[in-house]
Curated annotation (Swiss-Prot):
HAMAP family: Ribosomal_bL21 (MF_01363)
Keyword hit for Ribonucleoprotein: yes
Protein name per the record: Large ribosomal subunit protein bL21
GO biological process, one term: translation
Family indicated by similarity: Belongs to the bacterial ribosomal protein bL21 family.
C-alpha cells in the first residue's frame, strides 16, 4: 500500500516502513504524528484519488529525530567597490518513519 501526502506545499510518495526527511516539525523524537492531507491512496490494483483529499485517510508516522542539510554558501559581490558578503545556511529537517496508512 502507498499514499501520496502533502505537507506544507511539498508532496511525498510514502509506504509503511519508509524513512522520510521533511521540513522541520516541532515534535519530540519518539512521538507519533498524523499527516492528514492524503491526496491519493493505492494498493496495487485499486487507487483512490481525492478531490482534493481522500476522505478519512490518515498517514501515521513516528518522529526519529532532527538533522541538518548540507551547508549552502551565499556570496554577494559588487564589482569595483570592494563589496563582498559571504554567509552560510544549513536547513533543519525532521526524519520520520511511516508506521501505517489508514484509508
Amino acid at each position: 500500500m502507498y499514499a501520496i501526502i502533502r505537507d506544507r506545499g511539498m508532496q511525498y510518495r510514502v509506504e509503511p516502513g519508509q524513512v522520510l526527511t521533511i521540513d522541520l516539525l516541532k515534535a519530540e523524537p519518539g512521538s507519533q504524528i498524523e499527516l492528514g492531507e492524503v491526496l491519493l491512496v493505492g494498493n496495487g490494483e485499486q487507487v483512490k484519488i481525492g478531490s482534493p483529499l481522500v476522505e478519512g485517510a490518515v498517514v501515521r508516522a513516528e518522529v526519529l529525530g532532527e538533522k541538518k542539510g548540507e551547508k549552502i554558501v551565499v556570496f554577494r559581490y559588487r564589482n569595483k567597490t570592494r563589496y563582498r558578503r559571504r554567509t552560510g545556511h544549513r536547513q533543519r529537517y525532521t526524519q520520520i518513519r511511516i508506521s501505517e496508512i489508514v484509508a
